Amino acid sequence: MNLKNVALFAGFFFATLAIFVQGILPMLEPESRQLKITKVVRTDLGELKWMEHEATDYSESELIGRQVYIREGCWYCHSQYVRPVTGERRRWGPVTQAGEYAFDMPHLFSTRRIGPDLSRVGLKYSDEWHLAHFWDPRMVVPDSIMPRFAELFDGPHQGVKVVEDDEGNRTLDKTADTGNIFDYSSQEKIMLTPNAEGLVFVSEKGKYPVIWTPNDEFTGDTVNVIAQTEELEGLVDYIQKLGTNRGKWRDLFEPQSIDASMVSIPRSEEWIAFGKEVYTRRCEGCHGDNGNGNGPAATFMYEFRPRNFTAGVFKFRLTPSGSLPQDGDLWRTVTRGIRGSSMPSWHMLPDKDRIAVIQYIKYELAVDRSDPAEPY
């Protein structure tokens, strides 16, 4: 047997071995067919406990999203496996169990983490955050190296004129493109708030468009329109499914467990200066460079707009109405986020970053400067 035949045989053997080990053997393992997982549930007494349950299958929309995830190569950079080694549990959440992958064929463990692990990302961020992230990751993570996935959107349809309708509403000019997105005869309206650059995201087609800018978020006369698609919606649904088979594990996640009542931070110019850097890197994409709640990503956040810090109004606080929150209130919000809104948890930031950004928000953005003698 000559060397050429040996090489050919070896190549065929190892290719077959790889298919068997990575494709066939996992299906033969009993663990690959078990649905049992442990998840955190809240009992009738309000207690959080780990209990044994069965994993649930993907919905039709989630399966569409999973195919998009595979097609677009998301698994090249993102793993879906929390390893049983030091630091993984604290960084990502509970260690992976076999039952979580019972409906995954093929599995998407991946082997590299160029981007973060996604096995516990479900419900960490809002749907709107993910939409902004897919359109342009730098909107919400300025130092991200993730590519844009603008092709998943319908659009952009550029230079659409803002006009006034018969009822005095600011709406969008009817063109061939906008006619495919909106129903100009519909009685059901969709409120659209462009960002400062004039980008408008349409979350639901078939409604009558109304430009809604209560705080003069946008004063231009043309906008660029992008809209939701079935593949984009499915991809977001799939991402939000990841990790949810483990129940309310976030409520027991140690890094988010805090005693905010003990937090008190003296005012410091040094902290404020550093806080501005943190704000620019982590918060500006949603809340805007001046804290008015209209950052580049804000147009995607159609259900819960980012907080306008300049108004000095904070919903989650222990202080009386009309007053600023305590440092502990802001610490809790920054650390744990606000479930159901576009505000994610920032527990992974160093303490000094969270302290500094609270100082910057409190003493630079959320202050009434109408009296120069008492600017704070």
Where are these regions (language model features)?
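Hydrophobic membrane-insertion alpha-helices, especially the h-region
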Residues: L8-G23
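Alpha-helical transmembrane signal-anchor/signal-peptide segments
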Residues: L28-D44
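N-terminal positive-inside, membrane-proximal cytosolic segments immediately preceding the first
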Residues: M1-L8
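Short, non-ligating residues that shape and space the ligands of small metal-coordination modules
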Residues: R83-P84, N292-G293
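Conserved catalytic-core motifs of eukaryotic protein kinase domains, centered on the activation segment
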Residues: N294-A298
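Extracytoplasmic electron-transfer domains, predominantly the class I c-type cytochrome c fold
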Residues: A55, E62, G87-V236, T299-L349, ...
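The canonical Cys-X-X-Cys-His
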Residues: G65, R71-Q80, H130, L235, ...
